[in-house]
Amino acid sequence: MTPRFDLIGMATTDMARTLDFYRRLGLDIPPGAESQPHVEVTLPGGIRLAWDDAEMVRSFDPDWTPPTGSPRHSLAFRCADPAEVDRWYAELTEAGYEGHLKPWDAFWGQRYAVLHDPDGNGVDLFAPLPEAD
């Protein structure tokens, strides 16, 4: 049997703020999860998304330190339409989360925006642009 992609794991230095960010994007994260050192949810399609707080990561990797610099990966959330990209970007930045690239019409045919979650991970918002007439 070949390995099957199953889980995206991320380390966080502020579980409560991180889970609030992803709840705002519609992920079904159980109430009270912010007090746990490990949280995971199953996304539509079966892939799991998990977060470990810094202490949990150091329990099996004592030399771990949070990365610095630009994000090493991004999670991309598809929005219903271009206006939703703008709305979600505004809602999240107004809630105090870091906007990185304001919404723009990308040359590849999508309305696109980039934020950073509380740990600096890239989070993209996108929607197909209407076809030009």
Feature map (PLM): residue ranges:
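Glyoxalase I/VOC metalloenzyme domain signal
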Residues: 1-6, 11-33, 43-98, 116-133
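Active-site/ligand-binding-proximal alpha/beta "capping" segment
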Residues: 101-104
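Short, small/polar residue-rich loop motifs at catalytic or cofactor-binding pockets
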Residues: 107-110
